């Protein structure tokens, strides 16, 4: 199935901003959203959502024109700033003293944040990191088309920071007709490796696309994770079958809705397939184990433009003496080595080494070294 959808390109570094006086300050989430809007990562979006599209996305997981889109991409401003703005104006988008873009204001509105929390995150509990962030951000949304007038200079992983047009080119260069995307915000342990390689058996290439935008404080730092991906790919994956590049978005922790969002974005990066595992983009116990897979039943593959691949929870089985899942292994829980990401972080922080059935030794070494460094700097 083809994924040739038109990529939005709203990057124009020659755009004249000299006559624009007003400005809106962007937080880190809005800044990463601005870049992904401009480079086509969020195609078909061409800007921050206006009220009509926002309401439609929150209520129906579709834009007002019917296209599937599951996460509201919004630009929040304070009441004070909103009072100075008018529909029809061009306003500069600023972060850390730099102008990164311009928005043509089409809409200024006050969202019902409780409704957004309930429908997007399925909870209004402020202990949920996505809801907490939603409530912390300002209370008025500004919608409108954007232009990115300045590229970010201090990307932490410049050699892995590729726009959708570039990843598509890379896949083409490698002759990959089918590419499976894998989203992660964690180090890749044996369970993920098993799933990725199972998927790789049926496609030409694997696109490992770790998220390096804002995550919650107890997630393993991005630089440590990147090093762990490098050693894993170097030692255990065929180099001509895998491509590593970062996804600079913030983590929303919106579970099922974010699974759809992650699939749509990977389609833009050039993937034909997308891996959805257990509790994709989940946090705590807010979502059912396979809810992020079940939500895909609401959409056709044609509408999505990408084929989801669903995987059960995998583990090492001491009886099978292999990685397996409940689909392939008949043995009981007592034979399964299952460690959660949280459990692994705990072991590593205590300097304990997870078993080789759980994680590759090279990955463990990188993580222990990284976490020691973290302790020293805290």
Swiss-Prot record:
It catalyses: sulfate + ATP + H(+) = adenosine 5'-phosphosulfate + diphosphate. One of its GO terms (molecular function) is sulfate adenylyltransferase (ATP) activity. The keyword Nucleotide-binding applies. It comes from the Bacteria. Pathway: Sulfur metabolism; hydrogen sulfide biosynthesis; sulfite from sulfate: step 1/3. InterPro entries: ATP-Sase_PUA-like_dom, PUA-like_sf, Rossmann-like_a/b/a_fold, SO4_adenylyltransferase_pro, Sulfurylase_cat_dom, Sulphate_adenylyltransferase. Keywords: ATP-binding, Nucleotide-binding, Nucleotidyltransferase, Transferase. One of its GO terms (biological process) is hydrogen sulfide biosynthetic process. Disulfide bonds: none annotated. The keyword Transcription regulation does not apply. Its EC number is 2.7.7.4. NCBIfam families: PRK04149.1, sopT. Belongs to the sulfate adenylyltransferase family. This is Sulfate adenylyltransferase. It comes from Bacillus cereus (strain ZK / E33L).
